[in-house]
Amino acid sequence: MAITKEELLDYIGGLSVLELSELVKAFEEKFGVSAAPTVVAGAGAGVAAAAVEEKTEFDVILLDGGEKKINVIKVVRELTGLGLKEAKDAVEKTPTTIKEGANKDDAAAMKAKLEEAGAKVEIK
């Protein structure tokens, strides 16, 4: 008569910690396997590789509209396509995110244009 999986699980569930330890050792010897976790080392290497990866998306944040707000409003409208009122609100209610997820070159170009108009800008 064969033992079902359910019966086997019930039996193993009733074992003490010492008996379970002996069972694991017996499995290791009989089948030539190890119960030591191997995934832990691999996970650490993956995290290190992700940390080295270069950032590809940047946010352009307007910190201050400066003294020449009209010029900054014009540039904000040009870069974002916002209407006059929305662009004015963005310049007056700083800090404001002007662009999210821009690539490195676009973010740098936007920053240069806004700074040329008199704004203080940050790229994150």
Swiss-Prot record:
InterPro entries: Ribosomal_bL12 (IPR000206), Ribosomal_bL12_C (IPR013823), Ribosomal_bL12_C/ClpS-like (IPR014719), Ribosomal_bL12_oligo (IPR008932), Ribosomal_bL12_oligo_N_sf (IPR036235). Keywords: Ribonucleoprotein, Ribosomal protein. GO terms for molecular function: mRNA binding; structural constituent of ribosome. Pfam families: Ribosomal_L12, Ribosomal_L12_N. Coiled coil: none annotated. HAMAP family: Ribosomal_bL12. Belongs to the bacterial ribosomal protein bL12 family. This is Large ribosomal subunit protein bL12. It comes from Wolinella succinogenes (strain ATCC 29543 / DSM 1740 / CCUG 13145 / JCM 31913 / LMG 7466 / NCTC 11488 / FDC 602W) (Vibrio succinogenes).
